[in-house]
Amino acid sequence: MEHLLTRRQLLAGLPAGLLLMRGWAHGLEHGRAVLGYQLDLSVLFNFLTFSLTGTVVQEVDRRAGRYQVTMEGKGTAISTKTEATGIIRDGRFKPVESRSVHIFRGRQNTSTTTYDYEGQRIELHAVTHTLLLGRRRQVDGVLALPPGHHVDDLVSTELNFASNTLERDADGTYHTLVVRRARAEDEGPDDVSPDGYQVELVPLRFRPSPDVATGRLTALVDITRFSSWARSHQPARVTFAPDRRLESMQSSLILGTRLSVRVTGNA
């Protein structure tokens, strides 16, 4: 799925990555599963509301050492399709390519990211539009894969966490690197660079702990790594099922915006 997520792409894209749904315990080992999801978003204190319902098709072939995730969803004035493929090496999921097409309020947003492990580089090309004014953002960037460090997308991050192959510190904090559009920390929702954008690697860290009431693992995740509409002092709250699949997510964003995702089970 796309890694340079605007708020719109966060709406369309998260289900294929962080939201690889509980209920895929067997598919994670080997096989195919088709799952559903529901995503709701309100903007400007409910002045604008959007809902997206869709399916995620997940295929893992451990014998061949590869995986593929395809996500499609539709809602009022929005449709999305994302295909993410990767390889499995020494038990770890590693992204190879992600292609996304999102149509939102009549505007098409596209993104392609490739990970070249032989050439030791990441390449990303994207054309997106801001939500409120529809301003065009173009991203064309190449990065070197850092020696001795793993780089993930949202799909491989969730897969590695679920299979307990994501890197973990002694204090229980999981971490990896993800690629995003390089931007100023105080970027506004309709700010656009006339010179286009490069890309950068940023750390993604979260520390799950059991909820006192339910016993479910929960974590606060800084999604500024994926959306300029997020703020680091308002991390998203995610809840995981016993098999370490994401069960739900709630997030407060800027301009009175709220994002909620929930698992709807097998499609």
Task: Describe the role of every protein-language-model region.
Residues 7, 16, 20, 94, ...:
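A generic structural micro-environment signature
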Residues 123-187:
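A charged, solvent-exposed segment within the mature domains of Sec-exported extracytoplasmic proteins
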Residues 1, 138, 150-151, 209, ...:
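Intrinsically disordered, low-complexity peptide-like regions
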Residues 97-143:
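Surface-exposed, polar helix/loop patches in the mature regions of secreted/periplasmic/lumenal proteins
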Residues 26-117, 165-267:
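Acidic, serine/threonine-rich low-complexity disordered tracts
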Residues 2-3, 9-26:
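N-terminal export signals
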